[in-house]
């Protein structure tokens, strides 16, 4: 088995964008979200990580647009951003997305999140957005508690998968936080998807080396948009690792 590659399409104000360290105002615009996702699909990606940044920041919604993107793609989609209650969860699942990511709600409404983990199993992943050993919530604008305490609670609730993002790395192309990923994997038996900082094929090889300890996939965004490597090159590197 090789790591799963999830090219990222982050959407703000109807456009595909990339942020630096999650900071509002740091957007680089890349155009139509469907065109971006379709390009990754044509290059061989089997998953797309699709994010509604406006919903994540609590400043609006691109729900209809994202639902249309999911419908028009032929690959599996992990949908993220603003999923905080039953209504938003049901709407996200109703798009046909293979999996949804819950971030802020895991911190702000633990009882709801624990119930959802038990009820939906593999269709829900928990996004752990980390700065140091502190979690960030609400589009990374608020602190959300101690990473290890929250991870232990989510494990007890039966969380099936974690998407771990080092916020200080995200959108910077400075390399992933391998130490953080190793430590998370050591503390949970659930699979982990790595996100943040991936900039080279060597970074992908380093992440592939963590597959035996629990890393299952990798989200790549800015490196693909910036042309650091292609989806085809990334898939080949992961297959050969």
Swiss-Prot record:
Question: Which SUPFAM superfamilies does its entry note?
Answer: Ribulose-phoshate binding barrel (SSF51366)
Which top-rank group of organisms is this from?
Answer: Bacteria
Provide this UniProt record's keywords sorted from A to Z.
Amino-acid biosynthesis, Cytoplasm, Histidine biosynthesis, Isomerase
Question: Listed GO molecular functions?
Answer: 1-(5-phosphoribosyl)-5-[(5-phosphoribosylamino)methylideneamino]imidazole-4-carboxamide isomerase activity; phosphoribosylanthranilate isomerase activity
Give Gene Ontology CC terms: cytoplasm
Look at the named UniProt entry and state the broad enzyme category this protein falls under. isomerase
Its UniProt entry gives the catalysed reaction(s) as: 1-(5-phospho-beta-D-ribosyl)-5-[(5-phospho-beta-D-ribosylamino)methylideneamino]imidazole-4-carboxamide = 5-[(5-phospho-1-deoxy-D-ribulos-1-ylimino)methylamino]-1-(5-phospho-beta-D-ribosyl)imidazole-4-carboxamide
Q: In which pathway does it act?
A: Amino-acid biosynthesis; L-histidine biosynthesis; L-histidine from 5-phospho-alpha-D-ribose 1-diphosphate: step 4/9
Family matches, as NCBIfam families: hisA-trpF (TIGR01919)
PANTHER family according to UniProt? 1-(5-PHOSPHORIBOSYL)-5-[(5-PHOSPHORIBOSYLAMINO)METHYLIDENEAMINO] IMIDAZOLE-4-CARBOXAMIDE ISOMERASE (PTHR43090:SF2)
Q: What is this protein called?
A: 1-(5-phosphoribosyl)-5-[(5-phosphoribosylamino)methylideneamino] imidazole-4-carboxamide isomerase
Naturally occurring in which organism (per UniProt) = Salinispora tropica (strain ATCC BAA-916 / DSM 44818 / JCM 13857 / NBRC 105044 / CNB-440)
Organism lineage:
Bacteria, Bacillati, Actinomycetota, Actinomycetes, Micromonosporales
């Amino acid at each position: 088995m090789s790591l799963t590659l999830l090219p990222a399409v982050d959407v703000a104000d109807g456009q595909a964008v990339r942020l630096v360290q999650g900071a509002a105002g740091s957007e680089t615009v890349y155009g139509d979200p469907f065109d971006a996702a379709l390009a990754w699909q044509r290059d061989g990606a089997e998953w797309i990580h699709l994010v509604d940044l406006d919903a994540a920041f609590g400043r609006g919604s691109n729900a209809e647009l994202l639902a249309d993107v999911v419908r028009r793609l032929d690959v599996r989609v992990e949908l993220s951003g603003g999923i905080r209650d039953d209504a938003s969860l049901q709407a996200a699942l109703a798009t046909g997305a293979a999996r949804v990511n819950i971030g802020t709600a895991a911190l702000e409404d633990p009882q709801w999140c624990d119930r959802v983990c038990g009820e939906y199993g593999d269709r829900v992943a928990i996004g752990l957005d980390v700065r140091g050993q502190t979690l960030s919530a609400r589009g990374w604008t608020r602190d959300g508690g101690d990473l290890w305490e929250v991870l232990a609670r989510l494990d007890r609730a039966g969380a099936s998968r974690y998407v771990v993002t080092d916020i200080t790395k995200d959108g910077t192309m400075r390399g992933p936080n391998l130490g953080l990923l190793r430590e998370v994997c050591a503390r949970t038996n659930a699979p982990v998807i790595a996100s943040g900082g991936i900039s080279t094929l060597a970074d992908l090889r380093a992440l592939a080396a963590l597959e035996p300890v629990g890393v299952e996939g990798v989200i790549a965004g800015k490196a693909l948009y910036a042309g650091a490597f292609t989806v085809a090159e990334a898939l080949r590197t992961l297959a050969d690792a």
